Amino acid sequence: MTNKIYNHDTDVDIVHKYNAIGLKGWINQLQYIDKEIDKLLNLYAQSIQNKEIPARTLILFSKRKETNKRLYETVMKYSNIYSKAAECDDIQCNMAYLSEYERLRKSYQYHLTRYQKLKTICMITYFRVFDLD
């Protein structure tokens, strides 16, 4: 499926194309989060050795990294399957793809919200320890 929109595309075709673009964006964001968590884990590991922040911080980020990995794998798998959405020839087929996309979108948004909250709380703690505010 090409993501270019043509005049003859139906509304459903256009939605599928936008969703395919959205999936690519999610994949890129989840890859970025994975790299960011690695950097934060290294930073926090050093701080834990110096007893500057609680060890629980490392555990929380490790768990979030695992959650991120699972979601990334799920989105990748679905992204590969989603390319077949253009082959749908009835509303039930289209709705199946769109329903799964919406379910994944909610999981993705929930994950981002949880990650941002964790990062904010941990950064506030980190800055307080070093009195950097």
Language-model region placement:
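Charge-rich amphipathic alpha-helical interaction elements
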Residues: 1-133
